[in-house]
């Protein structure tokens, strides 16, 4: 079954790069572009806009490679606190190095690193020395009292004037960071101040994929962005400045709308006039023009909202949040007429769990067929589901054993009697190792292994929270997993 696409990725690459070129020309040949969101692996965009490739942003920038240089901003405050990226589990300092390696891997010139909010933090000084030993240029930008509202001070020699001027040589300076709150926008505006002092024409623009400004406020794509940022208190809203200036309704998010009057005044103080009449004007995002099937992206976005709902429920069950985000996403679901059972794989999994009294799982195949997996003495429900899916995709009869019990038994013995595990059932990674070994001599097992790539993009649901290992295995296989917010046992610790 061919996946329906809702987004024209090639059109996007061409249109987006051309629009950035025109913005560079608008400002006389130099543009500071604040790059928000994920550059290398925008999986959220690829899920809600089927056809959008996770690496589309970096591929788009690659079309401008000869004009681009990269500046990475990292907050000295975050370095001092050893702040960690939640999705990667690494510090902002380490992620700065990862970003630089990643950009260089694509052939980009990384100009420098800016330490923002620098006030002599020892960790920042150590990091600067490390970067300089690696041959990178490092600049310091300092805290400004009254930022961002004391504009006369900010746009003066005692404000931006105290910051070190970042030497750049190309027409498009992409300012990125390891995470939010790193000071990307402040770096851009500080540079505009210094460029203007030197008589160099330069401008600022912002690139973020979401919310998509030329879709309706309550469009599922934009609501999916609200669901994704429910823990950040971001909300989409009509851009009142754009409506007043042009009589056109566009969508932006609250933080950009709230700060725009300040930014406009800063632009006016730096160069005499503001090039923008609204926060929408500042953006360069062309994604909305590349949607080719609205029905497809609406359906995909609704699925994403449901996945976010279950993810936040499980985070709350684990004690990682206070549950506020769950209530916010529930409100978004009500606006679209969704309930938790709107997710097609939920009811089949719950039905098997109710019938057997044990954890169960369900997965939707590419052709729409829903398969289930139940808990047995040999396999957990997720492993059983995976075997059933591989049999189905490979056209292997259900009665054929892909892994003989005689193969599973010694693995269980090793787990329990040697390694001290209490659960003898095979996890997904253990199952796949056993299946791969069997594939050496068994054509059916070999055919099953060959089906693994077909699982990418499939939806799955389990009636209990899985182990971190099984969750990670599903993630690596590209399966979009959700779980009921409960554990298999009533124990207090779930390792």
List the predicted regions and their residue ranges.
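The conserved Walker
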Residues: 179-180
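Flexible phosphate-sensing "switch/lid" loops adjacent to ATP/NTP-binding sites
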Residues: 1-176, 191-352, 358, 365-367, ...
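Substrate-recognition/cap regions that form aromatic- and gly/pro-loop-enriched pockets
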Residues: 397-423
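A short, polar/charged loop-to-alpha-helix boundary motif
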Residues: 378-394
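Hydrophobic positions on the alpha1 helix immediately C-terminal to the Walker A/P-loop
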Residues: 187
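Residue-level structural signal for beta-strand termini and adjacent loop
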Residues: 203, 375-376
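Glycine-rich phosphate/pyrophosphate-binding loops
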Residues: 199-209, 393-404
């Amino acid at each position: 079954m061919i996946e329906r696409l809702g987004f024209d990725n090639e059109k996007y690459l061409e249109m987006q790069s051309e629009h950035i070129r025109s913005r560079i020309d608008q400002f006389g040949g130099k543009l500071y572009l604040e790059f928000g969101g994920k550059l290398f692996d925008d999986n959220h965009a690829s899920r809600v806009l089927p056809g959008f490739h996770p690496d589309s942003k970096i591929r788009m920038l690659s079309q401008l490679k000869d004009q681009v240089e990269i500046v990475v901003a990292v907050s000295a405050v975050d370095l001092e606190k050893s702040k960690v990226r939640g999705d990667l589990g690494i510090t902002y300092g380490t992620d700065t190095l990862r970003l630089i390696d990643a950009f260089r891997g694509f052939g980009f010139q990384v100009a420098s690193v800016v330490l923002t909010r620098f006030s002599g933090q020892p960790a920042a000084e150590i990091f600067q020395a490390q970067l300089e030993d690696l041959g990178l240029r490092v600049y310091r930008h300092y805290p400004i009292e009254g930022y961002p509202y004391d504009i006369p001070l900010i746009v003066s020699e005692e404000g931006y004037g105290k910051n070190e001027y970042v030497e750049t040589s190309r027409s498009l300076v992409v300012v990125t960071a390891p995470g939010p709150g790193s000071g990307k926008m402040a770096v851009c505006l500080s540079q505009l101040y210094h460029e203007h002092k030197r008589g160099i024409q330069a401008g600022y623009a912002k690139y973020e994929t979401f919310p998509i400004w030329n879709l309706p406020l309550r469009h599922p794509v934009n609501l999916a962005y609200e669901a994704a940022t429910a823990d950040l208190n971001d909300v989409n809203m009509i851009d009142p400045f754009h409506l007043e200036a042009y009589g056109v309704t566009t969508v932006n998010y609250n933080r950009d709308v709230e700060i725009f009057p300040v930014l406009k005044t800063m632009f006016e103080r730096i160069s005499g006039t503001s090039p923008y009449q609204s926060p929408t004007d500042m953006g360069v995002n062309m994604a909305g023009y590349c949607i080719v099937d609205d029905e497809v992206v609406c359906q995909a976005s609704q699925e994403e909202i449901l996945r976010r709902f279950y993810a936040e429920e499980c985070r709350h069950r684990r004690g990682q949040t206070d549950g506020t985000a769950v209530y916010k996403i529930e409100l978004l679901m009500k606006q679209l007429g969704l309930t938790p059972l709107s997710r097609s794989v939920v009811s089949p999994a719950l039905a098997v769990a109710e019938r057997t009294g044990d954890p169960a799982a369900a997965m939707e195949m590419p052709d729409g067929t829903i398969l289930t997996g139940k808990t047995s003495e040999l396999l957990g429900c997720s492993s059983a589901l995976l075997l059933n899916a591989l049999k189905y995709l490979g056209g292997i009869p259900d009665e054929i054993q892909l892994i003989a019990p005689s193969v599973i038994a010694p693995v269980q013995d090793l787990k329990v009697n040697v390694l001290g595990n209490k659960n003898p059932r095979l996890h997904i990674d253990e199952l796949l190792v056993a299946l791969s070994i069997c594939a050496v001599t068994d054509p059916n097992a070999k055919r099953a292994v060959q089906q693994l790539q077909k699982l990418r993009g499939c939806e799955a649901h389990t009636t209990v929270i899985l182990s971190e290992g099984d969750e990670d295995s599903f993630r690596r296989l590209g399966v979009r997993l959700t779980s009921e917010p409960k554990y298999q046992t009533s124990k207090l610790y779930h390792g």
